[in-house]
Amino acid sequence: MNQSPTWHDVIGEEKKQSYFVDTLNFVEAERAAGKAIYPPAKDVFNAFRFTEFNDVKVVILGQDPYHGPNQAHGLCFSVLPGIKTPPSLVNMYKELAQDIEGFQIPQHGFLQSWAEQGVLLLNTVLTVEQGKAHSHSKTGWETFTDRVIEAINQHQHGVVFLLWGSHAQKKGRFIDRSKHHVLAAPHPSPLSAHRGFLGCKHFSQANQLLASQGKEPINWHLPLTV
């Protein structure tokens, strides 16, 4: 029998909490009212679907989902195939091209292969209304994602947290740095990337930290087309 804890084991109880029920009811009511809410209901929890709890090696924290049509699919910074690569991800690719030998910038922004290797691509808030950034902040999602980070902090060892921008850094302030590794930099947004995100070498550093623990490094290379 597999004794490894799953997401259900570590955050299953959260789904019974009144705040979480209220959050889901709010989102459902917004959809029922005819508002375009992203990502689609089936994709809201994809970060957990593609990266099982016990497989988490790296956590990248985003803020809220992309709010344009067909962009968000439940993994922070990632967009569906066929959608133009958003500006922050363009800068992530620029950094990868400098940092990871042989990295070729793909023609898409679909990051699922990272998630499948143990990179938890977690937004702080898991839904958004079309065209309205942060429209679902303070609806309970932040509490839920705090619990997610607390569970990783408590039950795992040697996870590498990539915290880009003040929002992510504030969110990760309680991470136990004697158990885990925290790499902080400005956000990859065009507004701040040149203040130290570009040149941060977080992708190679994350792999060095994983390798030093005997863990398999992340293959950051993406298929050129999807």
Swiss-Prot record:
What does UniProt give as GO cellular component? cytoplasm
Pfam family membership, one: UDG
Where does this protein reside within or beyond the cell? Cytoplasm
Q: What is its EC number?
A: 3.2.2.27
HAMAP family with a match to the protein in the record: UDG (MF_00148)
* Assigned protein family: Belongs to the uracil-DNA glycosylase (UDG) superfamily. UNG family.
What protein name is recorded for this chain? Uracil-DNA glycosylase
- The gene for this chain is ung
